[in-house]
């Protein structure tokens, strides 16, 4: 490789390094998600304990397959790295992101240069939804990013073998067959997209397939067989049927409609690019009408067909759209190159290099500010908060197995980027039965965890009857200052607040603000506790409440 070639790839390398660094930072600097705390434990074992060997990992996956899901491959990866150490997974995830981007460009039959890289990054950072759920959240990333990357490897080799007559090397054959199996084992909607691609490729190239030699036919059939075996293992899991018993199965356009609306601009730009390409003048070696037809058959039609089975599942989350979005981005990259080549051919006086650089800069200026700000935010606020929480628990309460632990609450919501598509909300709440609090307390082996602002008190009034009435906290003038907590975002269990009157109040307001309770409740009060970061103390009810 000569110096000129190296210089040409320096901008590509810099963009990839910055992007990968951002992905790593946004993952590593945040607290773990509720799923990651929970997946650290052996599933189906009571009393449960953290995974500490391969026997635990095997037992956990066997239990999960029987009771929850067929996604054994992705959950094996998740639980393996939760056992071995998440930092390894953060690094691998950043590299997987670059491989994902590279494969999109590779499948579009274009060079891995700054022009195509800027189009892909623009699409990922601005045109798709739930970026953090797909690429930053580790459990989500292995489910969606890693599985979609496996899909791209498989369809890349399959397309090249069937359509481009490419002869694969021994290493490529191994990758081809392995990716077929891992894609089949990966995740339901990814298998639907891949299966649709394979079926349409088989239909449109069946005559060509019949003319292949025996060795090539066996390679293609073997790959489809491995994909099919993985798919059957995935969907036939008893755990899938157990989940369907809980969630049900009925035809609904609502979730699909919402998911499509969430990527409306990606759909619009892809459609416009196809229309423009369709009407480009034909060249001797290239018919753009034929190219657009191939794009429709190879990418758009699989997109449409694969949506159908998802309309029968109630759990068609927006984060599940990544393989669908990826097909559209491939088409967008392909057509962008055709359109710009046409522009450069027509406008001979246009400086191609300068125009391309200007175009790339515009895309990156639009796409990256929130992403870069979010990366900075993760070092300024998320990492110090993560270290504070973990050190607080580790140093103060790790050996107090039954203690209620009070930790600092995240207090920088006002500084979150207005377009918060890159930062996951993994912040513990005041209510100890919120889902992240519950899983954190299990993970750190303490009785319960509550989060409180540094200048606030938690006031808890325990009662021996069920009561979810909203009681106001009044100031000295009788004005409502705040109200009792009666619900959490995801309380576990949902009834946990019926026997607890809980609210938070600034420390300097405790003496002049009291909660107003009915006289009928006075005889049912069993305990009154005030908590802050220094600990807790029991007080008289008259310190915090008045009765009427």
Predicted regions and their residues:
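Transmembrane catalytic cores of multi-pass membrane glycosyltransferases
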Residues: 24-87, 91, 138-141, 173, ...
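Membrane-interface micro-motifs in multi-pass membrane enzymes
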Residues: 118-159, 264-270, 305-335
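Transmembrane alpha-helical segments
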Residues: 97-108, 150-162, 195-203, 271-276, ...
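Signature aromatic-anchored transmembrane alpha helix within multi-pass, membrane-resident enzymes
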Residues: 172-174, 288, 341-371
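Short hydrophobic alpha-helices at membrane interfaces in multi-pass membrane enzymes
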Residues: 160-181
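Intrinsically disordered, polar/acidic, low-complexity terminal segments
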Residues: 7-68, 82-100, 108-113, 215, ...
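Short, Lys/Arg-rich, polar N-terminal cytosolic tail immediately upstream
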Residues: 1-6
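Alpha-helical transmembrane segments
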Residues: 8-22, 116-123, 222-228, 301
């Amino acid at each position: 490789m000569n110096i000129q070639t190296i210089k040409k790839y320096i901008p590509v390398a810099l963009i990839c390094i910055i992007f990968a660094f951002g992905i790593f930072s946004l993952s590593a600097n945040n607290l773990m998600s509720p799923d990651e705390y929970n997946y650290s434990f052996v599933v189906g074992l009571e009393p449960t304990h953290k995974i500490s060997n391969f026997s635990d990992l095997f037992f956990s996956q066997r239990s999960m397959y029987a009771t929850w899901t067929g996604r054994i491959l992705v959950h094996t990866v998740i639980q393996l790295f939760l056992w071995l150490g998440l930092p390894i997974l953060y690094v691998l995830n950043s590299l997987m992101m670059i491989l994902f981007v590279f494969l999109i460009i590779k499948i579009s039959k274009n060079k891995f240069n700054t022009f195509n890289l800027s189009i892909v990054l623009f699409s990922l950072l601005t045109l798709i939804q739930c970026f953090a759920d797909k690429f930053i959240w580790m459990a989500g990333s292995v489910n969606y990013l890693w599985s979609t990357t496996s899909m791209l490897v498989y369809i890349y080799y399959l397309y090249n073998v069937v359509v481009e007559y490419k002869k694969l090397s021994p290493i490529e054959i191994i990758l081809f067959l392995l990716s077929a199996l891992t894609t089949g084992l990966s995740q339901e909607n990814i298998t639907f997209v891949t299966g649709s691609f394979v079926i349409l490729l088989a239909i449109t190239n069946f005559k060509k397939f019949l003319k292949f030699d025996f060795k090539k036919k066996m390679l293609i059939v073997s790959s489809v067989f491995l994909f099919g075996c993985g798919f059957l293992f995935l969907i036939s899991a008893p755990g899938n049927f157990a989940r369907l018993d809980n969630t049900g199965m009925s035809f609904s356009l609502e979730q699909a409609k919402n998911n499509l609306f969430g990527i409306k601009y990606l759909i619009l730009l892809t459609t416009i690019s196809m229309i423009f390409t369709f009407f480009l003048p034909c060249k001797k070696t290239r018919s753009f009408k034929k190219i657009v037809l191939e794009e429709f058959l190879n990418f758009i039609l699989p997109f449409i067909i694969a949506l159908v089975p998802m309309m029968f599942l109630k759990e068609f989350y927006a984060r599940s759209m990544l393989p669908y979005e990826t097909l559209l981005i491939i088409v967008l990259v392909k057509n962008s190159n055709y359109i710009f080549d046409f522009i450069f051919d027509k406008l001979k006086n246009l400086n191609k290099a300068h125009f391309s650089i200007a175009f790339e800069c515009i895309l990156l200026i639009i796409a990256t500010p929130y992403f870069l700000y979010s990366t900075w935010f993760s070092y300024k606020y998320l990492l110090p908060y993560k270290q504070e929480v973990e050190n607080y628990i580790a140093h103060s309460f790790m050996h107090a197995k039954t203690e209620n632990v009070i930790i600092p609450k995240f207090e920088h919501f006002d500084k979150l980027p207005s377009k918060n598509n890159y930062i996951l909300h993994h912040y513990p709440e005041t209510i100890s039965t919120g889902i992240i609090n519950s899983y954190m307390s299990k993970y750190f082996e303490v009785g319960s965890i509550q989060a409180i602002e540094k200048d606030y008190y938690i006031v808890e009034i325990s009662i021996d009857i069920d009561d979810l009435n909203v009681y106001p906290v009044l100031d000295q003038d009788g004005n409502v200052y705040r109200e009792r907590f009666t619900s959490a975002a995801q309380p576990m269990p949902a009834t946990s607040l019926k026997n607890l009157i809980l609210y938070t109040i600034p420390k300097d307001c405790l003496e002049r603000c009291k909660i107003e309770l009915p006289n009928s409740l006075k005889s049912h009060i069993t305990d009154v506790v005030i908590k802050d970061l220094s600990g807790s103390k029991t007080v008289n009810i008259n310190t915090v409440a008045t009765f009427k």
